[in-house]
């Protein structure tokens, strides 16, 4: 276990550049899984990723110094995969499978460099875009979000003295540990760390991972952060994300192709992966529409990740669909991951225990819960909902509808077209905090 005095390190911050991104493995595992598929099937596709701050009241460009942000983004572009990292990717087993990454893909990955970016300020916000081939721009999503979130944390703490920083981190540690102790009551619960993109800092995420490892033992199944998985000998976890159906939908040339695009993604995915990686993410264009038109073979997949509906409501919908298709939900897996905290984890676990296999991906409320921890009130330490989504593919606008309309992204006229094709049933407005 690596022990770092985080408060001292923050206070002694006197060097010119303290890199936030130190490795290209400091990303979510599903980015690498998706990248291999994109590299194999869609090398000629362009995709633009764009930053969106859902908390409009937070003026990011007023909180974060633009020169500092550029310096961090520029530094990230200098990083390459190390020999040690490439050997680990080639030789390690993931999800019980050896050589999950092909030698040809790894040979390409060894020379990978993050592409250029475009950054400007407008009305107190940053407009940050990444243009280029999909297999290059996709790798910006996680480091860009981690960089901005950590710069915001650093800016918020800049006025705190050494003693105040000690108090801040002592309270934050106690807050996390109290949550961990609550989870000890459920020895067969399964928890994983999904907190990279909106974390307080890399060092803090590492501490949270160590706390879960120490506190709940085998109930802690691993982390989505590939670098932390390698460094702490944990399982690297993750399946697929909304960007896959968003891009394929944007490339569609007709309403029929658009309607079929989520299922084409699944066909592509199962040509590369199997077993516990066969997890359906149904909500990109609305879960109700997805389930209504899903081919029968989708019911044979290992499980679902109901991401944007309230967890109990979303889980019940999936269980009902499995039963309608003659499948036993007790043999299937539900992965919950949307804005979870210990209260929702406990409630959801108790509700579904014994009815399905369960797993919980704990994100922002694990790795960035500093609200109320400072000796004085600092609003900027409260986590915000920041995303970096596909905004276009081959020049065509991309859309995400979601089960929560507050999470929808895309041009208004395109959102209306997608709603005409997919419908709007059972989409429920909920406030988006993280």
UniProtKB/Swiss-Prot annotation:
GO terms for molecular function: nicotinate phosphoribosyltransferase activity. InterPro entries: N/Namide_PRibTrfase, NAPRTase_N, Nic_PRibTrfase, Nic_PRibTrfase-Fam, Nicotinate_pribotase-like_C. It is an enzyme of class 6 (ligase). The modification Phosphohistidine is found at residue 242. It comes from the Bacteria. It holds the Pfam family NAPRTase_N. The keyword Isomerase does not apply. GO terms for cellular component: cytosol. It catalyses: nicotinate + 5-phospho-alpha-D-ribose 1-diphosphate + ATP + H2O = nicotinate beta-D-ribonucleotide + ADP + phosphate + diphosphate. GO terms for biological process: NAD biosynthetic process via the salvage pathway. Transiently phosphorylated on a His residue during the reaction cycle. Phosphorylation strongly increases the affinity for substrates and increases the rate of nicotinate D-ribonucleotide production. Dephosphorylation regenerates the low-affinity form of the enzyme, leading to product release. Its EC number is 6.3.4.21. Keywords: Ligase, Phosphoprotein, Pyridine nucleotide biosynthesis. Pathway: Cofactor biosynthesis; NAD(+) biosynthesis; nicotinate D-ribonucleotide from nicotinate: step 1/1. Catalyzes the synthesis of beta-nicotinate D-ribonucleotide from nicotinate and 5-phospho-D-ribose 1-phosphate at the expense of ATP. PANTHER family: NICOTINATE PHOSPHORIBOSYLTRANSFERASE. NCBIfam families: NAPRTase, PRK05321.1. HAMAP family: NAPRTase. Belongs to the NAPRTase family. This is Nicotinate phosphoribosyltransferase. It comes from Chelativorans sp. (strain BNC1).
């Amino acid at each position: 276990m690596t022990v770092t005095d985080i408060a001292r390190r923050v206070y002694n911050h006197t060097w010119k550049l303290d890199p936030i991104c130190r490795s290209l493995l400091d990303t979510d595992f599903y980015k690498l899984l998706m990248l291999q598929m994109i590299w194999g099937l869609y090398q000629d596709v362009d995709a633009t990723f764009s930053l969106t701050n859902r908390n409009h009241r937070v003026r990011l460009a007023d909180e974060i110094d633009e020169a500092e942000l550029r310096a961090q983004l520029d530094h990230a572009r200098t990083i390459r995969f190390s020999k040690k990292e490439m050997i680990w990717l080639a030789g390690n087993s993931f999800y019980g499978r050896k050589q999950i990454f092909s030698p040809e893909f790894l040979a390409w990955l060894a020379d990978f460099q993050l592409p250029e970016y475009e950054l400007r300020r407008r009305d107190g916000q940053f407009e940050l875009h990444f243009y280029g081939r999909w297999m290059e721009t996709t790798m910006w999503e996680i480091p860009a979000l981690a960089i901005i979130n950590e710069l915001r944390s650093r800016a918020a703490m800049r006025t705190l003295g050494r003693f105040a920083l000690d108090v801040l981190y002592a309270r934050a540690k106690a807050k996390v540990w109290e949550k961990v102790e609550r989870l000890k009551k459920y020895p067969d619960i399964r928890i994983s760390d999904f907190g990279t993109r909106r974390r307080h800092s890399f060092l803090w995420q590492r501490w949270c991972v160590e706390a879960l490892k120490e506190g709940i033992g085998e109930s802690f199944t691993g982390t989505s952060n590939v670098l932390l998985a390698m460094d702490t000998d944990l399982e690297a976890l993750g399946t697929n994300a909304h960007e896959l159906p968003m891009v394929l939908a944007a490339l569609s040339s007709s309403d029929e192709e658009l309607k079929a695009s989520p299922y084409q993604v699944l066909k592509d995915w199962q040509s590369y992966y199997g077993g516990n990686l066969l997890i359906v993410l149904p909500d990109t264009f609305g879960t109700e529409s997805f389930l209504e038109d899903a081919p029968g073979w989708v019911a044979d997949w290992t499980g679902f990740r109901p991401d944007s509906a309230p967890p109990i409501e979303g889980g019940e919908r999936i269980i009902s669909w499995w039963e309608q298709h003659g499948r036993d939900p007790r043999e299937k897996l539900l992965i919950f991951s949307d804005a979870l905290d210990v209260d929702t984890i406990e409630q959801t676990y108790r509700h579904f225990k014994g009815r399905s296999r369960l797993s919980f991906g704990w994100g922002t409320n694990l790795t960035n819960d500093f609200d109320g921890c400072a000796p004085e009130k600092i609003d900027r330490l409260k986590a915000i909902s920041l995303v970096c989504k596909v905004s276009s593919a081959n020049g065509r606008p991309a859309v995400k509808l979601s089960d929560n309309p507050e999470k929808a992204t895309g041009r208004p006229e395109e959102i209306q077209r997608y709603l005409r094709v997919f419908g709007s049933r059972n989409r429920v407005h909920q406030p988006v905090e993280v």
